[in-house]
């Protein structure tokens, strides 16, 4: 979308070449142009698509959803710190359980948490305080310690946050 100012400089007209306004009204996340191309240009967009969907309560367009699934392997080229930041935002969103479900359904969870999540605490995410360490610990509750520690190392978190997650998850 772009805005074109009128000659008087007071008003403007929105020029929507890609249907962005309709997508906003319909609450749909969609890539501009070919989704595979957009997600290959910057693989972090894969996680951002999930984050925006859960933060805004939007659906993901089927073609974009398919591309998110197909392009997840590109996350191997993204720094663990950047992946961790997106994961923190997903878990601290208004719909953390939906975020975890999307990450799992799209095959993205192994790129975020290499050892996966615990089968025990996932359903309780929406009842927990909006605190990353608490929600992350819930995802890893009662995991084998070696898996828990590998997940934590992979997230590249500050020591105090890592320690809190490990303590809570045991």
Indicate residue ranges for each PLM-predicted region.
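Arginine residue identity/basic-tract feature
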Residues: 30, 38, 45-51, 65, ...
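Conserved, hydrophobic alpha-helical core segments of structured domains
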Residues: 76-170
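Acidic, glycine- and histidine-enriched catalytic cores of nucleic acid- and nucleotide-handling enzymes
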Residues: 1-64, 70
